[in-house]
Amino acid sequence: MGRNGAGKTTLLNGLHLVLYGKRASHVGRTRADYETYLRESIHRGAHQSDGASVEVHFDATYDGELGSFRVRRYWTVGPDDQVNDGLAVFHDGAKSTFITDHWDEVIEEIFPLEISSLFLFDGEKIEALADPYQAAHVTRTAIESLLGLSILDRLSLD
C-alpha cells in the first residue's frame, strides 16, 4: 500500500501497457484512444518528439523452456502530430524479431490478458472485493476469466 498519488496505479498501467499494448484495458478501444493515451503518457517536461518508453524484465516458460524476457514498448510524436510506436522483445539476451512480430500470441501463451486482471489490480479493485455488494460480481468474473468461461460465452454469442 502507499499514499494516494504515489504512482501505484500508474505502475500497474505501465505494466499492462508494455505487455498488452493497445489491448490493455485502460487505454481505450480505438486506435485514436490508444494514441491519446500514449501522448498523455509522455512526461510533461519532455518534448513530444523525445517520446517515452516502458520496459519490463521477467523470466517465464515459453515454448517449453524457461527463459528471460526484456520487453520494451516505446513511442514518439512526430512533427506531423502522428504517434509512432514500437515494440522490441529480447529473449535470453538477444533481440528476437520473431517474438517481437508475434508478441500478442506469445504473451497470451505466457500470461493471458484474460487472467492478468486476477494478478494485476489496483486499490479500486481491492475496495470492490471488500464491498459486499460488488464482491460476488468481481469474484465471479475472476473465476470465469481463470477458467476461460468468458471466452466461451463470447464464442457462443458469435
Question: Predicted regions span which residues?
Answer:
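Conserved P-loop NTP-binding catalytic core
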Residues: M1, L12-S68
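The conserved Walker
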Residues: N4
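Conserved glycine(s) of the Walker
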Residues: G7
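Conserved NTP-handling cores and scaffolds of large molecular machines
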Residues: L15, L19-R23, F111-I115, L146-R154
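Glycine-rich phosphate-binding loops of NTPases
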Residues: G28-E40, G45, E65-L118, A128-T141
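Extended, Lys/Glu-rich alpha-helical coiled-coil stalks
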Residues: G123-D158
